[in-house]
Amino acid sequence: DLVSVLDAFEKKFGHLIPRLKWVNMGGGHLLTRQGYNVDLLVSTLRDFQTRYPGIQVILEPGSAFTWQTGDLVASVVDTVEHDGINTAILDVSFACHMPDTLEMPYTPKIAEAVDAGGIAYRLGGNSCLSGDFKEGYRFAEKLKIGDRITLCDMNHYTTVKTTMFNGVHHPDIVLADADGQCHYLRRFSYDDYKSRMS
């Protein structure tokens, strides 16, 4: 938490802090999460600024603004069973559309998955990269072509860390109203990939 990080920062580098122009308190502060102690955050930052006036404090709330606001909806385009491993190939890519699932690793909740029982699946991405898959999901029934897979809470990194590796198509960005009406905000095409290459 920020309080312990700041305490360690001041203990190790307190003699240097007065010479700084700014200090970055980092990211990952889920200010919008239910139960987040905003009052503690505010008092911690105010106390720091009182001790070190004139230093600009930077805070990166980042994902807090889009946390639990965007799902990535995929479809199963093929299924394979080999050596006892069930694989469902999706029309999205873990490497291209959600690299945080491989780098961090962040394991998104899947709305259609079950916690226990069911059938274990490896979910494969649609790029040619050998590591473009995610394991550890279970489904109540065998997946079939056309089944919908909803990867929850994907907005915070999906839109900023994507790549169009080898022309992999990006998913559309859609706003769904409370009544279920969908409005397309952005549809990607080959021209988006082509413009990045020139």
Give names to the regions the model predicted.
Residues 1-82, 166:
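Active-site loop/helix belt of alpha/beta enzymes
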Residues 44, 56-198:
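Charged (often Lys/Glu-rich) extended helix/loop segments that serve as interaction or gating elements
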